[in-house]
Amino acid sequence: MIQPQTRLKVADNTGAKEIMCIRLEGGSNRKFSNVGDVIVASVKSATPGGVVKKGEVVKAVIVRTKKGIARKDGTYIRFDDNAAVIIRDDKQPRGTRIFGPVARELREKDFMKIISLAPEVL
Protein backbone atom coordinates (compact mmCIF):
# COMPACT_ATOMS: atom_id res chain seq x y z
CA MET A 1 0.00 0.00 0.00
CA ILE A 2 1.66 3.15 -1.26
CA GLN A 3 0.23 6.57 -0.47
CA PRO A 4 1.51 10.13 -0.99
CA GLN A 5 4.73 10.89 0.97
CA THR A 6 5.81 7.21 0.84
CA ARG A 7 9.48 6.75 -0.06
CA LEU A 8 10.37 3.89 -2.40
CA LYS A 9 13.62 2.34 -3.63
CA VAL A 10 14.25 2.51 -7.37
CA ALA A 11 14.75 -0.94 -8.91
CA ASP A 12 16.39 0.13 -12.19
CA ASN A 13 19.57 1.74 -13.51
CA THR A 14 18.26 5.24 -14.29
CA GLY A 15 20.50 6.73 -11.60
CA ALA A 16 17.77 7.46 -9.05
CA LYS A 17 18.19 5.70 -5.70
CA GLU A 18 15.08 6.84 -3.83
CA ILE A 19 11.81 8.47 -4.90
CA MET A 20 8.88 9.88 -2.94
CA CYS A 21 5.31 9.38 -4.11
CA ILE A 22 3.54 12.70 -4.63
CA ARG A 23 0.44 11.61 -6.60
CA LEU A 24 -1.53 8.43 -7.32
CA GLU A 25 -2.81 7.95 -10.85
CA GLY A 26 -6.40 6.79 -11.28
CA GLY A 27 -8.75 9.27 -9.65
CA SER A 28 -8.59 12.41 -7.55
CA ASN A 29 -9.85 10.77 -4.34
CA ARG A 30 -7.66 7.66 -4.48
CA LYS A 31 -5.94 6.83 -1.17
CA PHE A 32 -3.62 3.85 -1.86
CA SER A 33 -1.78 2.16 -4.71
CA ASN A 34 -0.48 -1.39 -4.95
CA VAL A 35 1.76 -3.43 -7.27
CA GLY A 36 1.26 -2.54 -10.94
CA ASP A 37 -0.17 0.93 -10.30
CA VAL A 38 1.42 4.06 -11.77
CA ILE A 39 2.41 6.91 -9.45
CA VAL A 40 3.92 10.36 -9.88
CA ALA A 41 7.04 10.77 -7.77
CA SER A 42 9.88 13.14 -6.99
CA VAL A 43 13.49 11.93 -7.09
CA LYS A 44 14.93 12.34 -3.58
CA SER A 45 18.42 10.93 -4.12
CA ALA A 46 20.31 10.08 -7.30
CA THR A 47 23.78 9.03 -8.41
CA PRO A 48 25.89 11.53 -10.36
CA GLY A 49 25.79 11.07 -14.12
CA GLY A 50 22.46 9.25 -14.14
CA VAL A 51 19.53 9.68 -16.53
CA VAL A 52 17.38 11.36 -13.86
CA LYS A 53 18.44 14.10 -11.45
CA LYS A 54 17.49 14.90 -7.86
CA GLY A 55 14.29 16.96 -7.69
CA GLU A 56 12.97 15.73 -11.03
CA VAL A 57 9.29 14.70 -11.20
CA VAL A 58 8.88 11.27 -12.79
CA LYS A 59 6.26 8.58 -13.37
CA ALA A 60 6.94 5.15 -11.88
CA VAL A 61 5.24 1.78 -11.62
CA ILE A 62 5.25 -0.06 -8.29
CA VAL A 63 6.97 -3.47 -8.57
CA ARG A 64 7.34 -4.55 -4.89
CA THR A 65 5.50 -3.70 -1.66
CA LYS A 66 5.90 -4.73 1.97
CA LYS A 67 2.12 -5.09 2.23
CA GLY A 68 1.06 -8.55 1.07
CA ILE A 69 -0.73 -9.10 -2.23
CA ALA A 70 -3.61 -11.59 -2.12
CA ARG A 71 -3.81 -13.79 -5.20
CA LYS A 72 -6.83 -15.57 -6.63
CA ASP A 73 -5.51 -19.00 -5.60
CA GLY A 74 -5.51 -17.92 -1.94
CA THR A 75 -1.77 -17.32 -1.57
CA TYR A 76 -0.10 -14.13 -0.41
CA ILE A 77 3.16 -12.66 -1.60
CA ARG A 78 5.10 -10.03 0.29
CA PHE A 79 8.49 -8.37 -0.31
CA ASP A 80 11.15 -6.91 1.99
CA ASP A 81 10.94 -3.37 0.55
CA ASN A 82 8.79 -0.95 -1.40
CA ALA A 83 10.28 -0.50 -4.88
CA ALA A 84 9.34 1.11 -8.18
CA VAL A 85 10.64 1.34 -11.76
CA ILE A 86 10.75 4.74 -13.48
CA ILE A 87 8.77 4.75 -16.75
CA ARG A 88 8.11 7.03 -19.71
CA ASP A 89 4.64 8.23 -20.72
CA ASP A 90 4.24 5.21 -23.05
CA LYS A 91 4.68 2.80 -20.07
CA GLN A 92 8.16 1.70 -21.20
CA PRO A 93 10.97 1.72 -18.60
CA ARG A 94 13.54 4.53 -18.82
CA GLY A 95 16.33 2.26 -17.61
CA THR A 96 17.82 -0.76 -19.36
CA ARG A 97 18.14 -3.06 -16.32
CA ILE A 98 15.82 -4.09 -13.47
CA PHE A 99 17.20 -5.14 -10.08
CA GLY A 100 15.53 -7.65 -7.78
CA PRO A 101 12.36 -9.70 -8.17
CA VAL A 102 9.08 -8.24 -9.44
CA ALA A 103 5.50 -9.41 -8.90
CA ARG A 104 3.60 -11.41 -11.53
CA GLU A 105 0.72 -8.89 -11.29
CA LEU A 106 2.68 -6.59 -13.66
CA ARG A 107 1.89 -9.00 -16.52
CA GLU A 108 -1.86 -8.35 -16.12
CA LYS A 109 -1.24 -4.58 -16.27
CA ASP A 110 0.73 -4.87 -19.58
CA PHE A 111 4.21 -3.99 -18.29
CA MET A 112 5.75 -6.74 -20.44
CA LYS A 113 9.08 -4.96 -20.97
CA ILE A 114 9.64 -4.76 -17.20
CA ILE A 115 8.74 -8.47 -16.86
CA SER A 116 11.26 -9.42 -19.57
CA LEU A 117 14.07 -7.33 -18.04
CA ALA A 118 13.53 -8.57 -14.48
CA PRO A 119 15.86 -11.31 -13.20
CA GLU A 120 13.01 -13.03 -11.32
CA VAL A 121 9.21 -12.88 -11.52
CA LEU A 122 7.36 -14.10 -8.41
From Swiss-Prot:
Family in the record: Belongs to the universal ribosomal protein uL14 family.
Record keyword Ribosomal protein present: yes
Family annotation (HAMAP family): Ribosomal_uL14
Protein's recorded name: Large ribosomal subunit protein uL14
Biological function: Binds to 23S rRNA. Forms part of two intersubunit bridges in the 70S ribosome.
PANTHER family xref list: 50S/60S RIBOSOMAL PROTEIN L14/L23, LARGE RIBOSOMAL SUBUNIT PROTEIN UL14M
Gene source species: Thermoanaerobacter pseudethanolicus (strain ATCC 33223 / 39E)
Alphabetically ordered keywords of this record: Ribonucleoprotein, Ribosomal protein, RNA-binding, rRNA-binding
InterPro entries: Ribosomal_uL14 (IPR000218), Ribosomal_uL14_bac-type (IPR005745), Ribosomal_uL14_CS (IPR019972), Ribosomal_uL14_sf (IPR036853)
Pfam family, any one: Ribosomal_L14
GO MF: large ribosomal subunit rRNA binding; structural constituent of ribosome
Record text on subunit structure and interactions: Part of the 50S ribosomal subunit. Forms a cluster with proteins L3 and L19. In the 70S ribosome, L14 and L19 interact and together make contacts with the 16S rRNA in bridges B5 and B8.
Biological processes per GO annotation: translation
Organism classification: Bacteria, Bacillati, Bacillota, Clostridia, Thermoanaerobacterales
Any one annotated GO CC term: cytosolic large ribosomal subunit
